[in-house]
A protein has these predicted regions:
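Active-site diphosphate/adenylate-binding microenvironment
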Residues: 1-35, 40
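Short gly/pro/ser/thr-enriched loop/turn and capping motifs at secondary-structure boundaries
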Residues: 6-7, 28-30, 58-59, 83-87, ...
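Conserved thiamine diphosphate
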Residues: 43-134
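Short glycine/proline- and charge-enriched loop/turn segments
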Residues: 15-20, 91-99, 166-168
Length: 177
């Protein structure tokens, strides 16, 4: 996966051992995560496999939930859903004068109903408490689960590097004031 959710996952999840974080890095592979998580679960059936995706990336290959259900592959898909292409919108905010173009995903797709229609379990979380409860329950199930986590469209991730700049020029939110 690629996007804000990828950076948050790298920054804030406490990994306990090597090879727990499968990532494409910054190669722009939206939608990579769901298929990769199915492969990881098949390779290591004894491991808990969780994919963290943005709602834009999830839409790229959401049909793979049918594969998970049909083949009884119990992965957990956490969707960080801000109803926009978050990283693209953040760049448009910071570097293009808030000229937003083609980033809004407000077509009303209900990821919980989609999960259920494809034979998976679906939960929606709008608070930390709802997320904790959904994740705790998902970890006890032996079936594919989708957790649709709603966040605000203006949540940004830092540090950030401007287009064409070197990594040494990375900046944080505090630099924006």
């Amino acid at each position: 996966e690629v996007g804000q959710h990828q950076m948050w996952s790298a920054q804030f999840y406490k990994y306990k051992s090597p090879r727990q974080f499968l990532t494409s890095g910054g190669l722009g592979t939206m939608g990579y995560g769901l298929g990769a998580s199915l492969g990881a679960k098949c390779a290591f059936p004894e491991k808990t496999v969780i994919n963290i995706a943005g709602d834009g990336g999830f839409r790229m290959n959401m049909n793979e939930l049918a594969t998970a259900s049909r083949n009884n592959i119990p992965i957990i898909e956490i969707i960080i859903n801000n109803s926009v292409l978050g990283m693209v919108r953040q760049w448009q905010t910071l570097f293009y004068g808030k000229r937003y173009s083609n980033t809004v995903l407000d077509d009303g797709v209900d990821f919980v109903k989609l999960a259920e229609a494809l034979g998976c379990v679906g939960y929606r979380a709008e608070t930390k408490e709802e997320f904790s409860k959904a994740l705790s329950t998902a970890l006890t199930l032996n079936k594919p689960v989708v957790i649709d986590c709603r966040i605000g469209k203006d949540e940004n991730v830092y540090p950030m590097v401007a287009p064409g700049e070197a990594i040494s020029k990375a900046f944080d939110a505090s630099d924006m004031k």
